[in-house]
């Protein structure tokens, strides 16, 4: 009550901030008349003037009014588009490192030019992040005309482009690309063997288009670069044959072999199911005779394959979650309906689905590098984003990314009509109503966009419309190539467009069809009269569609997130145009069945409803929205859970990547190598000659043999110590250190100091990369089973942190030993031989990256489903703390505390490796 009273008196925080920004808008507008008088050359010279001001110490904030005014005037001259006042506000919000919520059709692409231009003046690079390659190339080409005119360079990055071209694109003032490409290039750069092989020059400022799609929807899917692992594909096929012999239970208590947790996306074997599975596995010869338990240590691989096969059959549907094309299983993005060619689910799930569909099973992969979008985008020194729908996720943006959401007013009032949901008993009644609505719109000349949640439904609707002889277009993963054309025509009178889950997002649907598209199709020699005739015809179509009610949106199912529903609705009513929307639901829809059906069924029974009857009531809509909020909270918990685990990996990743950067930047690492060698020798001597021990406990022959076998150093220790009095462990360590130092000095003298320095760097990088790769595999195994610690009354996350730290420390100790042993064993005789070795290694990395898979990690890959259940049993408040938001990852100083959490200084802990 007090909050609402204060809001009425002083306005909301959003309103107060808008008032502050409006005062800056007035300053920008005051400069317009003066800038309009400038010649093109004088206006273009402003860019050089701004750059000089920045070098002289002037801040970007001080430059903002004039820079925005220059960008607006340049846009008017080059693109024929002048920024509205609300677009200036949107640009300021983006510059301030916030999220601008702007409705569809408000010109987000044009808004971005303002902060992009201003921040690119600093010369550190600006990344404009889009959801697909088509939008990246389109926006780079279109807006690139403006930036180039103003004297700034523009690049675009996409998969498969030549190395030198990609380096040039990242070297440009402004770089366009997808979130995946920026992420994978970051990981690739941290696998590079020299500075010259790296693409990026640091992550300074990013503007994320459709920020909710990238930072929320895709936050559960880490980016993974993986290479082939040594795993037999035959086992997937053999285990797959067993699944049809297992019986699915209706629920956890019912009879059968396994039950499906649709909320947690998990499949669980019952006690009976375990016995039945063991019996079938024995019959198939997969479990050997004498193996009395499926869960015996030697059978963990079989359990892994069985779980993957169960999930493939029970949770993943063809033409919903994936399609089969050209003998391959191709993932369908659940949020956009697009295919994700080249992406593979991990943890053996993709192979299990291949076995289920009877297509060739490809080898399982080993993780080489990975990062979540959450941690990738938190590396940027400044981050901002724009979307039509962010306010419903404002808490998540603030708590995870430290990003505040500001709602930007529309240029014209929204007049779209959002009708109440219509709820039916079953799907057939629902789709009959949908078809009638579509036919009614088509007859009246009103364009209609039908949003579906899967390819299967879109094709079913298409078949019904074809039989009814209703002309229509289908936009889903299978028609990706025609996407822009279909969207451009979706606003034509009577046009019917079926779109899978917001595919085509990023292109406005213009009432009457896209005028630009029609003009572009004109003959290059067309006269002004021809162009006028085309524009007149378009105006007639535009007015006819407005008179028919504008674009009508039909939703065939509620999505898990209200935001996705709002995105679909937001396609209508752009820039003050008329429009309408309605969702058609049934009790058989996934969301209704899992979360909302009981209450609605009760209402329907009380009302005596029969098949074909419909409920249209705001109370039902509110109940459904409550169900959606439940799912949103559940999905937030999963994303937060993923982040909690990945934050552990992220601290380790930062240490390893920081060390790689130091290695690549350093001219010489001789001091580091000497320090590591002495530490390794001390540990080796202590192993055979323990401190404070008597000589009877020493194993001098073992020490001598190890130095010979691992180091190639013949050191007759026993003879050297004969006749000496008061020999202790410290004296022996000194003798060994001295001998090894002389041995290394002799090797350096024989091949030359320069070659030795190059060899040290090469060996350190190679061994560190190999150790990190093996550590990632170990962490994967740890993560997959960590939820089981909950049964031992232990906190899985705390156990994961503890064991991850121990594993990381062991990995670094192993790296130290292996580096010194490798340097002792490698035989290099000349600089030419060293150069050949480096080139071979570089080619191997290039080949590995070409053969690698760029994957989406399966959402439950962090034990999320199991742990989410165990977290619900905790006392209130446990595990609820919000992680501190880290927006930047500065270089760790040698005297700073080590990021691993040991409490030691960095130089005495993990910094010692480099």
From Swiss-Prot:
Its EC number(s): 7.4.2.8
Pfam family membership, one: SecA_SW
Cellular compartments annotated: Cell inner membrane; Cytoplasm
Described purpose of this protein according to its UniProt entry: Part of the Sec protein translocase complex. Interacts with the SecYEG preprotein conducting channel. Has a central role in coupling the hydrolysis of ATP to the transfer of proteins into and across the cell membrane, serving both as a receptor for the preprotein-SecB complex and as an ATP-driven molecular motor driving the stepwise translocation of polypeptide chains across the membrane.
Reaction(s) catalysed by this chain's protein: ATP + H2O + cellular proteinSide 1 = ADP + phosphate + cellular proteinSide 2
Subunit structure: Monomer and homodimer. Part of the essential Sec protein translocation apparatus which comprises SecA, SecYEG and auxiliary proteins SecDF-YajC and YidC.
The entry's keywords: ATP-binding, Cell inner membrane, Cell membrane, Cytoplasm, Membrane, Metal-binding, Nucleotide-binding, Protein transport, Translocase, Translocation, Transport, Zinc
Residues noted as binding ATP in the record, renumbered to the chain: 87, 105-109, 508
PANTHER family assigned to the protein according to its UniProt record, in alphabetical order: CHLOROPLAST PROTEIN-TRANSPORTING ATPASE, SECA INNER MEMBRANE COMPONENT OF SEC PROTEIN SECRETION SYSTEM
Source organism of this protein record: Xylella fastidiosa (strain M12)
Required cofactor names: Zn(2+)
Name the record gives this protein: Protein translocase subunit SecA
Source taxonomy: Bacteria, Pseudomonadati, Pseudomonadota, Gammaproteobacteria, Lysobacterales
Cellular component GO terms, alphabetical: cell envelope Sec protein transport complex; cytosol; plasma membrane
């Amino acid at each position: 009550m007090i909050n609402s009273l204060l809001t009425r008196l002083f306005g909301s925080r959003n309103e107060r901030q808008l008032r502050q920004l409006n005062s800056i808008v007035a300053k920008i507008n005051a400069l317009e008349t003066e800038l309009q008088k400038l010649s093109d050359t004088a206006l273009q010279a402003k860019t050089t003037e701004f750059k000089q001001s920045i070098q002289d110490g002037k801040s970007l904030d001080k430059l903002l009014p004039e820079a925005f005014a220059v960008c607006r005037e340049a846009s008017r001259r080059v693109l024929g588009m002048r920024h509205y006042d609300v677009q200036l506000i949107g640009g300021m919000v983006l510059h301030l490192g916030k999220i601008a919520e702007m409705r569809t059709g408000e010109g987000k692409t044009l808004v971005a030019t303002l902060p992009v231009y201003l921040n690119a003046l600093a010369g550190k690079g600006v990344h404009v992040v889009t959801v697909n390659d088509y939008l990246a190339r389109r926006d780079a080409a279109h807006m690139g005309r403006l930036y180039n005119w103003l004297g700034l360079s523009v690049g675009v990055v996409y998969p498969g482009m030549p190395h030198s071209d990609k380096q040039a694109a990242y070297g440009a003032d402004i770089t366009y690309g997808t979130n995946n490409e920026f992420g994978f290039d970051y990981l690739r750069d941290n696998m590079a063997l020299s500075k010259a092989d790296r693409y990026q020059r640091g992550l300074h400022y990013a503007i994320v288009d459709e920020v909710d799609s990238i930072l929320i929807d895709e936050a559960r899917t880490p980016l993974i670069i993986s290479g082939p692992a040594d795993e037999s594909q035959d086992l997937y096929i053999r285990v797959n044959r067993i699944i049809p012999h297992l019986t699915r239970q209706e629920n956890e208590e019912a009879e059968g072999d396994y039950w499906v947790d649709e909320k947690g996306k998990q499949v669980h074997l019952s006690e009976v199911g375990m016995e039945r599975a063991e019996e079938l596995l024995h019959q198939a010869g997969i479990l050997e005779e004498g193996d009395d338990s499926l869960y015996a240590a030697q059978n963990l691989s079989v359990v892994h394959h069985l779980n993957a096969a169960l999930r493939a059959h029970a949770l993943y549907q063809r033409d919903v979650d994936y399609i089969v094309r050209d003998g391959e299983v191709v993932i369908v993005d659940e949020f956009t309906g697009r295919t994700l060619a080249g992406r593979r689910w991990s943890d053996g799930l993709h192979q299990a689905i291949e076995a289920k569909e009877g297509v060739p099973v490809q080898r399982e992969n080993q993780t080489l590098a990975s990062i979540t979008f959450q941690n990738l985008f938190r590396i940027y020194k400044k981050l901002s984003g724009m979307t039509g729908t962010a306010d419903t996720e404002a808490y998540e943006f603030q708590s995870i990314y430290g990003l505040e959401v500001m709602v930007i007013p529309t240029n014209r009032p929204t007049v779209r009509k959002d009708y109440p949901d219509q709820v039916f008993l079953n799907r057939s009644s629902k789709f009959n109503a949908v078809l009638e609505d579509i036919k009614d719109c088509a007859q009246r000349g009103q364009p209609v966009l039908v949003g579906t949640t899967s390819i299967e439904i879109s094709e079913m609707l298409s078949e019904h419309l074809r039989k009814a002889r209703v002309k229509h277009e289908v936009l889903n993963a299978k028609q990706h190539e025609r996407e822009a054309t279909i969207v451009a025509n979706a606003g034509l009178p009577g046009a019917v467009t079926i779109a899978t889950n917001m595919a085509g997002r990023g292109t406005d649907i213009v009432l009457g069809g896209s005028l630009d598209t029609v003009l572009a199709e004109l003959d290059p020699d067309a006269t002004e009269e021809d162009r006028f005739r085309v524009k007149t015809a378009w105006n007639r179509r535009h007015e006819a569609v407005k008179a028919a009610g504008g674009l009508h949106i039909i939703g065939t199912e509620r999505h898990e997130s209200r935001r996705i529903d709002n995105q679909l609705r937001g396609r209508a009513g752009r820039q003050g145009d008329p429009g309408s929307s309605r969702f058609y639901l049934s009790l058989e829809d996934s969301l209704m069945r899992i979360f909302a059906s009981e209450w609605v069924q009760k209402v329907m029974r009380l009302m005596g409803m029969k098949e074909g009857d419909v409920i249209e009531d705001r109370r039902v809509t509110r109940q459904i929205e409550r169900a959606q909020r439940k799912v949103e909270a559940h999905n937030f918990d999963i994303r937060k859970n993923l982040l909690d685990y990945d934050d552990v990996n992220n601290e380790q990743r930062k240490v390893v990547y920081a060390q790689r950067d130091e290695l690549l930047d350093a001219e010489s690492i001789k001091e580091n190598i000497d320090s590591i060698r002495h530490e390794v020798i001390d540990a080796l001597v202590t192993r055979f000659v323990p401190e404070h021990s008597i000589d009877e406990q020493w194993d001098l022959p073992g020490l001598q043999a190890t130095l010979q076998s691992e180091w190639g150093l013949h050191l007759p220790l026993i003879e050297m110590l004969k006749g000496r009095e008061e020999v202790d462990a410290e004296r022996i360590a000194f003798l060994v250190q001295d001998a090894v130092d002389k041995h290394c000095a002799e090797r350096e003298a024989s091949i030359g100091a320069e070659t030795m320095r190059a060899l040290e760097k090469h060996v350190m990088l190679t061994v560190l990369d190999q150790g990190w790769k093996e550590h990632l595999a170990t962490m994967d195994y740890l993560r997959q089973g960590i939820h089981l610690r909950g049964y031992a009354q232990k906190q899985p996350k705390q156990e994961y942190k503890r064991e991850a730290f121990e594993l990381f420390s062991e990995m670094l100790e192993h790296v130290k030993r292996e580096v010194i042993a490798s340097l002792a064993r490698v035989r290099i005789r000349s600089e030419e031989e060293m150069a050949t070795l480096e080139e071979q290694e570089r080619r191997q990395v290039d080949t590995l990256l070409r053969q690698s898979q760029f994957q989406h990690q399966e959402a439950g890959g962090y034990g999320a489903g199991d742990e989410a259940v165990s977290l619900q049993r905790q006392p209130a408040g446990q595990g609820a703390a919000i992680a501190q938001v880290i927006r930047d990852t500065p270089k760790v100083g040698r005297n700073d505390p080590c990021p691993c959490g040991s409490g030691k200084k960095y130089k005495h802990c993990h910094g010692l490796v480099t």
